[in-house]
């Protein structure tokens, strides 16, 4: 039964007119009705809240709402298959990432007369991955050049991926690709693989930050296809991963002042040629002609006034490793000359990363610009 609110002793009492008996009866009825309605409302809210909670759990496993490829519907009971949400493929950052990776692969394989147009369609059989890894690592793999059957393709892919994983030295849980996923043209697995390769070999490219893909996980339960969606991160903070998270003047030049960047390049070319001309050497392309480390080593000898014994470095390096050793040796000579350890990695220079090369040469210019 509804009760009257307790009166505060601080509030002065005011005369209250007496209500007729019939009004008291009405108040009692309305009070009961109000209590019933309140309880019903509360029960309804609880029911709605419970339904909302159940929907949050069950909706990810609701029947799929878009058309699947016929092959993706041929699942055994409880079998699980993942695929990219078709709507996610149109994401601008994902499109940018795929374009950057395709352009990078085509640049690396320009001498092989290989042109990649679609990552999933062109990389699934292992042929392009083999050529890409051989170029990056300067190592020939012992695999068949051409494979037609699915079994032969998977065997080749197995060998290529094992070699890649051995080189990358990633912990098992960080390896998000395998023979089956790559051969099945799983875009998520292929992107993870290419991003890992580009970061390990310090590819001279800029991957877009924080690229994610909406992945649909399809499962067959009691004869019905059900799905749930998860957000798969492909790239995080790519500058932090590559060790270039501290922005400097060269980041600003590249991003906002390409005209001034050309002036800096011409200044550095003039500076290095002033000294390399003494050996009848000349530089026209900064990013490529310093990539094997030879000119860097010779330049340090000229700037410091000593002869670098030819047995100390590879005069004609023919592998990625030898080029890295040359650049590392040049970095040691720079530190011996009083310079701080260069921020770029030797691999950055070998991979023709222009920004990294400019950083190294500008440090030399700052210290030795008055040397004749």
Swiss-Prot record:
Keywords: Acetylation, Actin-binding, Angiogenesis, Cell adhesion, Cell junction, Cell membrane, Cell shape, Chemotaxis, Cilium biogenesis/degradation, Cytoplasm, Cytoskeleton, Membrane, Phosphoprotein, Repeat. One of its GO terms (biological process) is actin-mediated cell contraction. Residues 223-372 are annotated as: Required for interaction with TESK1 and ILK. InterPro entries: CH_dom, CH_dom_sf, Parvin. Its main location: other. Residues 21-25 are annotated as: Interaction with ARHGAP31. Belongs to the parvin family. Plays a role in sarcomere organization and in smooth muscle cell contraction. Required for normal development of the embryonic cardiovascular system, and for normal septation of the heart outflow tract. Plays a role in sprouting angiogenesis and is required for normal adhesion of vascular smooth muscle cells to endothelial cells during blood vessel development. Plays a role in the reorganization of the actin cytoskeleton, formation of lamellipodia and ciliogenesis. Plays a role in the establishment of cell polarity, cell adhesion, cell spreading, and directed cell migration. This is Alpha-parvin. It comes from Mus musculus.
């Amino acid at each position: 039964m509804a009760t009257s609110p307790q009166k505060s002793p601080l509030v002065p009492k005011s005369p209250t007119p007496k209500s007729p008996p019939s009004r008291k009866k009405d108040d009692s009825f309305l009070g009961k009705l109000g209590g019933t309605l309140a309880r019903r409302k509360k029960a309804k809210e609880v029911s709605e809240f419970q339904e909302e909670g159940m929907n949050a759990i069950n909706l990810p496993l609701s029947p799929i709402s878009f058309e699947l490829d016929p092959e993706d519907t041929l699942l055994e009971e409880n079998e699980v298959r993942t695929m990219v949400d078709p709507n996610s493929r149109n994401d601008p950052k994902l499109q940018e990432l795929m374009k950057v990776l395709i352009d990078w692969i085509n640049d690396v394989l320009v001498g092989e007369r290989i042109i990649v147009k679609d990552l999933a369609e062109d990389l699934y059989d292992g042929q392009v991955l083999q050529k890409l890894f051989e170029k990056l690592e300067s190592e020939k793999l012992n695999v068949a050049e051409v494979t037609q059957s699915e079994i032969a393709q998977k065997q080749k892919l197995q060998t290529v991926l094992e070699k890649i994983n051995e080189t990358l030295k990633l912990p098992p849980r960080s390896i998000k690709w395998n023979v089956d996923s790559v051969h099945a043209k799983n875009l998520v697995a292929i992107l993870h693989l290419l991003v890992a390769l580009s970061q390990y070999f310090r590819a001279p490219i800029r991957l877009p930050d924080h690229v994610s893909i909406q992945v649909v996980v399809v499962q067959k339960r009691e004869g019905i296809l059900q799905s749930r969606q998860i957000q798969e991160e492909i790239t995080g903070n790519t500058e932090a991963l590559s060790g270039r998270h501290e922005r400097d003047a060269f980041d600003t030049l590249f991003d906002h002042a390409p005209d001034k960047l050309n002036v800096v390049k011409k200044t550095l070319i003039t500076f290095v040629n002033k000294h390399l001309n003494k050996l009848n050497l000349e530089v026209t392309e900064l990013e490529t002609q310093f990539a094997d480390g030879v000119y860097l080593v010779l330049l340090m000898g000229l700037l410091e006034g000593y002869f670098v014994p030819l047995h100390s470095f590879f005069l004609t390096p023919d592998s990625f490793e030898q080029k890295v050793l040359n650049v590392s040796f040049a970095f040691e000579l720079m530190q011996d000359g009083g310079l701080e350890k260069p921020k770029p990695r030797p691999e950055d220079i070998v991979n023709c990363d222009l920004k990294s090369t400019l950083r190294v040469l500008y440090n030399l210019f700052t210290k030795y610009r008055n040397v004749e």
